[in-house]
């Protein structure tokens, strides 16, 4: 087996350093690559991590000189032994920290697409391409830069093809998206598990600067239609997403929530979760009551009783008593009668208030 000094010598010679004749360079490089390929094959079949760690360095060293060699490593990963997979995942980040991002991007996207030959694309469930994306994203953040535009565009273009794993591939890139890209990827994010979804929304909200301002993110979530067409998302996931935003009180402040809701209540048709968000805003921000009254007035002017939101509207008004008395008085007679019939406690309070007003 080759020791570290030998590895460095072979790599140096393969790159042509100190070799005068091109023919000699080609011959040495071919031998180095052939031996490295054999070592890679043996490493991926190794049953012990120690053996895999002993055989991989030559191949990884040559990847420094020829990043396109990453393709074979990525392609062979899924069929490798458990020990080899663990070793590759341990060693790969160190390599990716030093390779040109553009070169890694080209190899990674080609493998995800199944290019350039007829070989099947990498499995979307494989941890290796996801690991590579996270390493590149962390590196870009640490360096105060960004990831290559080709990486962002390429991964987002593959999100739908990657099925349920598509959202996970977008997560590392969220801080680097522009507004239109962030909006486009939201449906895929909402197909993540609840915990991953919460982390993804936090990554969007805490990015500097965020691709979507907090109020814009809330608005876009309300614009998504549950299980309706290509952009449809599971209703439970949409509820979880909006609630996760509301729970991020440092980012989604009272002002951000009410500003977003002022836009939501003007939408036509009114989003299905409008009243739920208003109620949760009241619960999380009791001092938002005055702003909420303004939202409820707007909805009443828009004849909210003719929509599916009416039940939630009445519930919200009952929660807001006594501030909401005027809203009950402004309801059409038939709707007021039905609302009071289902909430006799509110009826008693309104009657008592009316009597007090007459007595005064």
Residue ranges, per PLM feature:
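Eukaryotic alpha-helical solenoid repeat scaffolds
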Residues: 1-360
């Amino acid at each position: 087996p080759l020791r570290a000094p030998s590895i460095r010598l072979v790599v140096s010679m393969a790159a042509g350093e100190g070799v005068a004749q091109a023919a000699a360079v080609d011959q040495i490089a071919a031998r180095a690559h052939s031996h490295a390929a054999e070592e890679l094959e043996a490493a991926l079949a190794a049953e012990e991590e120690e053996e895999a760690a002993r055989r991989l360095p030559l191949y990884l060293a040559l990847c420094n000189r020829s990043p396109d060699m990453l393709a074979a490593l990525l392609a062979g990963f899924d069929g490798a032994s458990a020990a080899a997979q663990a070793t590759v995942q341990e060693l790969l980040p160190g390599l990716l920290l030093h390779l040109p991002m553009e070169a890694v991007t080209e190899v990674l996207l080609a493998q995800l697409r199944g290019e350039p030959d007829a070989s099947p694309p990498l499995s979307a469930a494989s941890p290796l391409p996801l690991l590579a994306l996270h390493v590149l994203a962390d590196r870009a953040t640490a360096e105060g830069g960004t990831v290559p535009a080709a990486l962002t565009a390429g991964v987002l273009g593959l999100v739908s093809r990657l099925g349920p794993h598509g959202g996970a591939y977008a997560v590392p890139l969220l801080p680097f998206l522009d507004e239109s890209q962030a909006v486009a990827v939201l449906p895929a994010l909402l197909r993540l598990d609840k915990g991953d979804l919460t982390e993804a929304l936090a990554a969007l909200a805490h990015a500097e600067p965020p691709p979507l301002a907090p109020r814009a993110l809330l608005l876009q979530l309300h614009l998504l239609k549950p299980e309706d067409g290509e952009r449809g998302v599971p209703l439970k996931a949409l509820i979880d997403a909006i609630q996760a935003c509301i729970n991020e009180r440092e980012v989604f402040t009272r002002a951000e929530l009410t500003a977003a809701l002022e836009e939501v209540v003007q939408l036509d048709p009114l989003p299905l979760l409008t009243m739920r968000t208003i109620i949760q805003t009241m619960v999380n921000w009791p001092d938002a009551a005055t702003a909420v009254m303004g939202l409820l007035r707007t909805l009443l002017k828009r004849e909210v009783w003719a929509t599916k939101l009416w039940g939630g509207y009445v519930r919200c008004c009952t929660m807001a008593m006594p501030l909401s008395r005027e809203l009950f008085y402004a309801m059409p007679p038939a709707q007021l009668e039905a609302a009071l019939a289902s909430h006799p406690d509110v009826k008693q309070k309104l009657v008592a208030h009316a009597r007090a007003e007459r007595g005064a």
